[in-house]
Design a protein with these regions (language model features):
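Active-site neighborhoods and metal-handling regions in enzymes and metal-associated proteins
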Residues: 1-599
């Protein structure tokens, strides 16, 4: 079935490309800060392709178009691109060219690649330069072709900014600036251009609301050895925030003056830039007169290691969040089949339980509630117009989280609503085993997620199955639900940043199995990396679990587990009951006792 709306938009875009002398036009999923999740204003790729996932790049040329996305979105993209004329390129699959390889093979000498350099990361822009230089291809990077076509484009975001109290942040702005400058000095830089939104919020102890579910404000910062300049929309600042920034000696300038400011800098500064988040436009602006050190934002690692105040508040918040999710599971299991419940109304009920928590601020991402085969799409999102009705059979996968004044949560449970097949039981059991094996990791300091990923993936690989995504990611503190530099994946990919686990880093533990057209299973906890014994061999480490939500006993078949896996699972379920039951009523408590096997 043709999607004429998208086809017509692409026709208008191609006409604009011809007018501007552009042969290939690229649209990533990004804002001016290369954020993972973006405000509606920046959803240009979605506007021209119909693909709604959080990761993907659209490339359009005279007689075709292609979308590159990762394994989380293959099923979703296939459905959403149907009839648009946009071809799906499945990243990291055998025989599928990368976007750079595709350009190298298809763009001709003398042709032009165009994009809006403000939404292309410098790292990517430099790759395209290198690939295309061989064929004398021109890059036109000051072209936002969407603006004249997207006539009802949403307004540029400018939500209210708030101050995060130091008692909640755990460190003052001065302490954070001192730590940042120390790391700048180690990199031999006398200035830092900071463009990553969550790093900016962390550094200045402020929060915004410019991206749905991500408490960030559109901003940049230029940090020197003795000054800090924040570029932010001043209409987003009230008197309290302005006075707070002034009291901490932070010079505030209008957001859209950053390019002129950088152009006005005296030549010869040694400026640290992180090319993953610095836009190609800003990079090219600085490159003309400044010496650039291309490295990682020092703030990223500082932010990832949660301080004692953050850790303490996270433990409190994760417990409250776990209670809310447990109550939701009880409600779901006792009401399904007795009243109409859809994927959407189930998600709404869970949100309602979270809103009852006094510290609740917002969801940390739109809830994913996928019933039966819908759960095979890792980032499926139901709508009131298009959602499944739940029946007392099969399984519902619910991936959800909250933003609280005290932490950001992310938890997934796959819930049996009635009878399931033997294959589903086996798959569920092995996913639970995978979670438990990683939970009990014990390692020497120096390991990254790539070293530990096999602990979760092995039980699933043993069935000749894989999940096309990472096993874990960091989680922000009243910030983005996806945070680096720590992550957990089994293989190295281009541009991937690896980080050694440090005491106080958090990481999700979320293996899964996704069978297209049948079912999807994921179980997800968040864990803290902590120091353990230190001896002549070095510093040993382990994980402490933050998430305490029951694993569905109805779908566990212990014949697939070894004695150690059974022991780990029983210990987790017992701890869930001990921690959660004091907050439940008698009926809920009795159900939880049976659900966890303590009764």
């Amino acid at each position: 079935m043709e999607n004429k709306v998208i086809q017509d938009r692409l026709t208008l875009l191609r006409a604009k490309m011809q007018e501007e002398g552009i042969d290939f036009y690229m649209m990533p999923t990004a804002d001016f800060h290369n954020s993972e999740y973006v405000n509606d204003y920046f959803k240009v790729r979605e506007y021209f392709s119909n693909f709604t996932g959080s990761n993907g790049t659209l490339l359009v040329w005279k007689d075709g178009a292609g979308l590159w996305t990762d394994g989380r979105y293959f099923i979703q993209a296939e459905a959403e691109l149907e009839g648009t004329g946009v071809e799906l390129f499945r990243m990291l699959q055998e025989g599928v060219p990368t976007i750079e390889e595709f350009l190298e093979q298809n763009i001709q000498q003398g042709q032009t690649l165009g994009f809006d350099g403000r939404v292309i990361a410098a790292m990517d822009g430099k790759k395209y330069e290198k690939v295309l230089a061989k064929a004398q291809i021109c890059i036109a990077y000051e072209k936002d072709l969407a603006d004249s076509i997207w006539t009802d484009r949403p307004d540029f975001p400018a939500g209210k900014v708030t101050v995060l109290d130091e008692k909640i942040a755990g460190k003052s702005v001065e302490e954070k600036l001192t730590q940042t400058r120390e790391k700048m000095a180690k990199d031999c830089a006398n200035a830092l251009l900071l463009t990553k939104l969550d790093d900016l919020m962390w550094l200045f102890n402020i929060r915004g609301c410019d991206v749905e579910c991500n408490p960030v404000a559109m901003s940049y910062a230029y940090i020197t050895e003795d000054t800090a300049t924040l570029f932010i929309q001043q209409k987003a600042l009230d008197t309290q925030v302005s006075e707070y920034l002034a009291a901490h000696h932070i010079d505030v300038k209008e957001y859209d003056t950053v390019v002129d400011f950088l152009k006005s800098l005296p030549a010869g500064n040694v400026i640290l830039v992180d090319n993953r988040y610095c836009s190609y436009t800003l990079y090219k602006t600085l490159q003309k007169n400044q010496r650039l050190i291309e490295g990682k934002n020092p703030t990223e690692l500082l932010k990832a290691i949660k301080n004692p105040v953050e850790q303490s508040r996270m433990q409190e918040i994760f417990l409250k969040d776990s209670v809310a999710v447990t109550k939701f599971i009880y409600w779901l299991k006792t009401h399904v089949g007795k009243e109409k419940i859809t994927e959407v109304t189930a998600a709404d009920y869970l949100e309602q339980k979270r809103r009852e928590i006094p510290e609740f601020l917002d969801l940390s991402f739109p809830t994913i509630a996928g019933y039966k085969s819908n759960a095979a799409m890792m980032h499926y999102e139901a709508t009131p117009e298009n959602c499944a009705t739940l029946e007392p059979e099969g399984m519902l996968l619910v991936d959800s989280g909250g933003q609280y004044l005290g932490g950001t949560t992310d938890v997934t449970r796959t819930i049996a609503l009635g009878p399931v097949s033997d294959e589903m039981k086996k798959h569920y059991t092995m996913v639970a085993a995978a979670v438990m094996q990683l939970t009990h990791a014990h390692w020497l300091y120096g390991c990254t997620g790539r070293n530990l990923d096999i602990l979760a993936r092995q039980p699933i690989w043993d069935m000749d199955i894989d999940y096309q995504c990472g096993t874990g990611h960091g989680v922000g503190y009243i910030l983005n639900v996806h945070e680096g530099p720590q992550n957990m994946r089994w293989r190295f990919t281009g541009g991937m940043v690896e980080a050694v686990f440090e005491d106080g880093m958090d990481i999700t533990n979320e293996p899964g199995i996704y069978i297209q057209g049948s079912h999807g299973i994921r179980i997800e906890n968040v864990m803290l990396a902590k120091n353990d014994v230190k001896n002549e061999y070095g510093q040993f480490m382990h994980f402490e679990t933050l998430t305490w939500v029951p694993i569905d006993r109805e779908v566990i078949d212990e014949k697939y587990l070894n004695d150690t896996q059974i022991k780990y699972l029983h210990e987790y379920q017992k701890t869930v009951y001990e921690k959660i039951s004091p907050y439940l009523n008698e009926e809920e408590k009795e159900w939880l006792a049976a659900e966890t096997g303590v009764k």
